[in-house]
A protein has these predicted regions:
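Flexible hinge/switch segments at interdomain interfaces of large molecular machines
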Residues: 138-142, 253-259, 328
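Short acidic, gly/pro-rich beta-turn/loop elements at beta-sheet edges
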Residues: 158, 205, 240, 308, ...
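Glycine-/small-residue-rich beta-strand-loop submotif within the FAD-binding core of flavoenzymes
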Residues: 195-203, 251-258, 323, 351, ...
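Glycine-rich phosphate/ribose-binding loops and adjacent secondary-structure elements
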Residues: 266-412
């Protein structure tokens, strides 16, 4: 394991008279190997001086090699090449049709298909929209069945926010702000907004970081804000808070979120304004009143089913119901999540969606409460699948990121 390094001084001597620049190169390589032996941080380099760097180089480019040359077109980790290619083609206005037949194995154990009719009809455009708003909502919202899921300013750039909202305005669908609140870039093109309020109460907090009803009223009464969504948890890291380091809190982000510059921007794991199902519903009623009667609901990734049953029971006891519930699947994405949370915490979308739909149906409230779904929805088949399982509409985040140019490098 040492001979490649030990050969470098011999090669330097052998080439000194013939090619001095080669001798200089081999001498430099000898010094690199000597430093590898003395450094205390990487045992691989101490055991394999000089050649150990090859291991790190190969490890560095492994994801790209695998994605471009080895990965199967249908390997969904997290999105398959075929899924990404479909979004890329449609985002660019290119031909997305395929010839010769499907590449899928129709007889595989995981094969899925839709049942068609022998008498197909042209779809009525009205069927692509739903009305969100319960009996206590004074300003129901006519929403598209496919929308932009929550992604915050700060996680996305100003230009990305602009592009998404411009698309929402052109396509007539809603744009979820994410818990980072409403930035000036969300307002440039006038696309419909769903204002997400997380545990940090960004955009609706006072100087001490407490919930501010006045700030809520100021933001929520804007004509562009169509609904308010309380974030209880997200699929990619349910039960986990978040920290935006002080170094990343720019002047724009600080102004948008209502946080001081030079300090970490912290999202606690849970809300401080409520702690029980009844208090959650009372908070929903309070936000609905502050917004002037706009639809208010919450987003969650299902954990213990009994906790959602508790919320459902509180709806019956108090008579207060959310206008909508968004079920976020554990397969959802985020900028950064601990591996254990991303891989092993939370209920996948299809299971969580069935639980929410069946629970609301069982207690007689399904007709009053609309249900959204988010988690790996990029095609019309993905959308139809969740609609068949009980959802009223679907949201997509990473699908729109692909449309913006995301390459799935997994280095968010």
């Amino acid at each position: 394991r040492y001979w490649p390094w030990l050969s470098t001084p011999l090669l330097a001597l052998a080439t000194l008279a013939w090619q001095p620049w080669l001798a200089l190169l081999f001498s430099a390589l000898f010094l690199v190997g000597l430093n590898d032996l003395r450094q205390p941080h990487r045992s691989v380099l101490r055991n394999y001086p000089l050649t150990g760097h090859l291991r790190f180089a190969l490890e560095y480019i492994r994801p790209e090699i695998r994605q471009y040359f080895i990965e199967d077109d249908e390997a969904e980790y997290p999105f398959s090449r075929n899924q990404r290619a479909l979004v890329y083609a449609r985002a660019k206005g290119q031909n997305d049709k395929r010839g010769f037949g499907s590449l899928k194995n129709m007889y595989s154990p995981n094969a899925e298909w839709l049942l068609h009719s022998n008498r197909p009809r042209h779809a009525d455009p009205k069927t692509f929209r739903i009305t969100i708003g319960g009996p206590n909502c004074r300003h129901p919202y006519s929403a598209s069945i496919f929308n932009i899921s929550a992604m915050s300013f700060g996680a996305l750039s100003a230009n990305a926010i602009r592009a998404l909202n411009k698309g929402a305005a052109a396509g007539g669908f809603m744009h979820d702000t994410g818990e980072g609140s409403i930035s000036p870039y969300h307002r440039e093109f006038g696309g419909d907004l769903v204002w997400e309020i997380g545990s940090g109460y960004f955009g609706c907090r006072d100087a001490e970081g407490r919930f501010s009803p006045e700030r809520v009223q100021e933001q929520a009464t804007s004509a562009q804000v169509k609904m308010i969504e309380i974030k209880l948890s997200q699929g990619a890291k349910p039960g986990h808070g978040g920290v935006l380091p002080a170094a990343k809190v720019s002047e724009e982000i600080a102004a948008t979120r209502g946080v001081p510059m030079g300090q970490d921007c912290i999202s606690p794991a849970s809300h401080s304004e409520f702690s029980t199902p009844t208090e959650l519903l009372q908070f929903i009623a309070r936000l609905r009143e502050l917004s002037g009667g706009k639809p208010v609901g919450f987003k969650l990734c299902i954990g213990h089913p009994t906790e959602f049953f508790g919320i459902a029971k509180a709806m019956l006891e108090t008579g207060i119901t959310p206008d909508f519930i968004v079920v976020d699947g554990a397969e959802g994405g985020t900028g950064a999540a601990p591996a254990e949370f991303a891989d092993h915490v939370g209920m996948p979308l299809r299971d969580g969606l069935r639980l929410v739909h069946n629970t609301l149906f069982a207690i007689g409230l399904r007709q009053r409460i609309k249900v959204g779904a988010s988690g790996k929805i990029v095609s019309s088949f993905d959308l139809l699948r969740v609609l068949a399982l009980g959802a009223d509409w679907g949201n997509s985040a990473r699908g729109f990121m692909f449309a913006l140019g995301c390459l799935q490098s997994l280095s968010c």
